[in-house]
Amino acid sequence: MDIIIIIIDDYYFDLTIYANMHPGGRKILKKFHLKDATDKFNQVKGHGDSFVIGELDKYCVGQVKNIDIEKYIQENYRI
């Protein structure tokens, strides 16, 4: 399984498990692994809906400036 962690609005979101359920497919999320997807996220119709935001919040692992993402990956995944 590919690890998929993206950045939206300066927060990391671990979408590894969610990726297979994403309506646009896993491939588009993988493209943004460890990259800022804020602009693309905001361009997609419906992404601003409270339901989508609420679902996304479930996968938030921390603010970019406050988390060592490499350490997070090592602690949560066998790589």
PLM feature segments, named:
Residues 1-79:
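Histidine-anchored, small-residue-rich loop motif
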